[in-house]
């Protein structure tokens, strides 16, 4: 994602609430920006995803390390070691939790899915569950911010002769006082949205394809498929290795889902170098805690085999 372009559109053009932020093209500019937004702050490359290159900076003593991490973790860093990537430095929000609102732009206009709650680790998704157990006021505000963001981007796309149709993953911060901030936006299906493969009649991938093909996506398409007030959860299966990875004990893992609906999606990724998300487990439960426990149990029951590179 292009964080600079998106942040300027969201805050400066659309007036959406965000954390204080600055952009920097050099370490010296980063120093100035960090002083403006104040410590603690977060430093990210303007082009990256899944937490790559992101650092929380508590004091000026750690700022150079954060600059170097952003340069190393930026998109397309390999082969461009002598080039500097612009970074965003923003104030560290007094965060309570994060939400993703999958928002669909189609020929029928803008519609949203139920907000998705999540757990992050090192700036990357590890678990998500839907529907999020949140107050109605936060739910309404979250959907409103998401719609405003996607309406603005769709207008820009259409001014350029494109449709702008598809799924957008709008990321929001919920602060301890109950207020919401726009964080980021992915103009595509979102990793936390993989839970929709078990929670909705139409997954985020199906909605993306249908919208692009010109099908009018209304609220009927975004309804949950859960029954009896169930909750659905996903658990990212992240493997640390060097080489090719395979999975065994799959049947036993799926049987560990405590008689609830469950599923497992193994990605067709050829190898791992360091750590990589290689699969996702999906499960339902009568409560948020039960759904998360079931998805985690499936993930932990898997066994891996590795062939060194």
Indicate where each model-derived feature is located.
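Active-site nucleotide/adenylate-binding loops and adjacent lid/helix of ATP-dependent enzymes
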Residues: 1-154
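A short, glycine/Asx- and small/polar-enriched loop/turn
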Residues: 37-38, 175-181, 275-277
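A short beta-turn/loop motif at secondary-structure boundaries
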Residues: 48-49, 91-95, 173-174, 225-229, ...
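Short beta-strand micro-motifs enriched in acidic
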Residues: 104-106, 173-175, 267
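Protein kinase-like catalytic core scaffold
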Residues: 111, 168, 180-184
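Short, flexible active-site loops
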Residues: 123-133, 184-197
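Active-site "cap" helix and flanking loop/linker of ATP-utilizing ligase/carboxylase catalytic domains
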Residues: 141-170, 176, 186-243
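Peripheral (often C-terminal) accessory segments that flank ATP-dependent C-N-forming ligase machineries
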Residues: 210-309
């Amino acid at each position: 994602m292009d964080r600079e372009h998106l942040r300027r559109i969201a805050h400066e053009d659309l007036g959406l609430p965000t954390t204080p932020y600055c952009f920097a093209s050099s370490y010296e500019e980063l120093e100035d920006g960090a002083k403006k937004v104040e410590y603690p702050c977060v430093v990210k490359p303007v082009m990256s995803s899944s937490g790559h290159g992101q650092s929380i900076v508590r004091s000026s003593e750690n700022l150079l390390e954060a600059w170097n991490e952003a340069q190393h973790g930026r998109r397309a860093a390999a082969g461009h070691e002598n080039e500097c990537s612009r970074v965003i430095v923003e104030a560290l929000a007094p965060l309570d939790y994060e939400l993703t609102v999958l928002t669909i732009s189609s020929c029928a206009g803008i519609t949203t899915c139920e907000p998705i709650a999540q757990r992050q680790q090192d700036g990357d998704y590890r678990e998500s569950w839907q529907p999020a157990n949140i107050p109605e006021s936060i739910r309404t505000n979250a959907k409103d911010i998401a719609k405003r963001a996607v309406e603005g981007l769709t207008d820009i796309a259409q001014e350029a002769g494109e449709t702008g149709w598809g799924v957008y993953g709008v990321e929001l911060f919920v602060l301890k006082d109950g207020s919401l901030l726009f964080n980021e936006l992915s103009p595509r299906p979102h990793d936390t949205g993989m839970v929709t493969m078990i929670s909705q009649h139409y997954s985020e991938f199906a909605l993306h394809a249908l919208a692009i093909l010109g099908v009018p996506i209304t609220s009927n398409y975004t309804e949950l498929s859960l029954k009896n007030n169930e909750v659905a959860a996903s658990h990212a299966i992240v493997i640390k290795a060097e080489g090719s990875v395979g999975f065994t004990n799959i049947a036993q893992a799926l049987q560990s889902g405590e008689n609830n609906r469950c599923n497992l999606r193994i990605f067709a990724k050829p190898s791992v170098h360091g750590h990589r998300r290689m699969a996702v487990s999906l499960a339902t439960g009568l409560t948020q805690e039960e759904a998360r426990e079931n998805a985690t149990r499936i993930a932990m029951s898997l066994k891996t085999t590795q062939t060194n590179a």
